[in-house]
């Protein structure tokens, strides 16, 4: 993600579209993420209505989730930093293979 290119609301909308295109839009009921700084949950909020521009150095979570009542729930969480011309930087390092818990 590049400095000043998108708002928090834009990023949320992009993620919602991907989840909707995958057939799970109605089950994505939470905001996409939030800022991390002096507090663990702070602005900007990656959600509808937050029109703040994301600028270089901002740190936030990206945590899309799908919860289908009585069936399943899934959430991933990454921490990212908005970059300059080079784009953003992913700070989270963990395995990406799917783990099914029955």
Model-identified regions with their sequence ranges:
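Active-site neighborhoods and metal-handling regions in enzymes and metal-associated proteins
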Residues: 1-102
